[in-house]
């Protein structure tokens, strides 16, 4: 069974896909579905660590209620990820491993440079440390 960390579905109907993305080789960490044009699995776009890193990572330091002091997060900008899959929706529905779900307007993800973090302070995030992916 694959590890699905996040399910980003768009509050719109699914359209026919326009492009085939490369299939991941490693363990799947992220599954995107909904109103996306580019997929690599039936109606979905799935990613492992390597395929996420190929999109280009950014880092920034911030404080948060989840970590002590200033923390460096490194990950893929959600804006870039949404462009890569050809997302056409306006809302991201994000579901974590523990079934916690939240909704983020896509415009907020773009306006505030939200990232999908893979690393915290230079280390890959583990499940027990809020990983393996974390929306920041």
Model-identified regions with their sequence ranges:
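N-terminal intrinsically disordered, low-complexity segments enriched in P/E/S/T
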Residues: 19-136
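Bacterial N-terminal signal peptides
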Residues: 2-15
């Amino acid at each position: 069974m694959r590890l699905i960390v996040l399910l980003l579905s768009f509050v719109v109907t699914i359209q026919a896909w326009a492009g085939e993305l490369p299939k991941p080789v490693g363990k799947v960490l992220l599954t995107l579905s909904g109103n996306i044009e580019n997929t690599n699995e039936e109606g979905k776009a799935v990613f492992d660590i390597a395929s996420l890193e190929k999109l280009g990572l950014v880092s920034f330091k911030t404080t948060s209620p989840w970590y002590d002091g200033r923390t460096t997060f490194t990950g893929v900008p959600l804006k870039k990820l949404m462009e890569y899959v050809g997302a056409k929706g306006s809302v991201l529905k994000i579901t974590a491993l523990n079934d916690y779900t939240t909704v983020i307007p896509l415009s907020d993800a773009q306006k505030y440079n939200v990232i999908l973090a893979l690393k915290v302070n230079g280390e890959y995030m583990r499940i027990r440390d809020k990983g393996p992916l974390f929306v920041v």
